[in-house]
């Protein structure tokens, strides 16, 4: 089952800003986010406490997202990079 990936405005804005600083990392990050459509809970992703939020680390990049099984959606909440 393929999920629909939805980017929240804050995540899109931050991704665009970080893409200017690290184009190669941004390309890999975008690829990983697209892959969440096929596997919303990949190996290496961690659930944050008992919440519905998940974090995925990719080198210096972090992706905070929320898979919603009832609507078959993955909502990308925030994208960040470790300084």
Regions found by a protein language model. Name each.
Residues 1-6, 16-26, 56-62, 66-83:
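Enriched for short, Lys/Arg-rich terminal
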Residues 14-17, 32-35, 47, 75-78:
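Residue-level recognition of specific faces of alpha-helices
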């Amino acid at each position: 089952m393929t999920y629909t990936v939805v980017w929240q405005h804050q995540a899109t804005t931050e991704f665009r800003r970080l893409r200017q600083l690290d184009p190669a990392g941004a390309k890999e990050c975008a690829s990983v986010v697209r892959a969440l459509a096929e596997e919303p809970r990949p190996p290496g992703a961690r659930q944050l406490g008992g919440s519905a939020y998940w974090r995925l680390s990719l080198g210096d990049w972090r992706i905070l997202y929320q898979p919603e099984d009832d609507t078959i959606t993955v909502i990308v909440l925030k994208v960040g990079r470790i300084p």
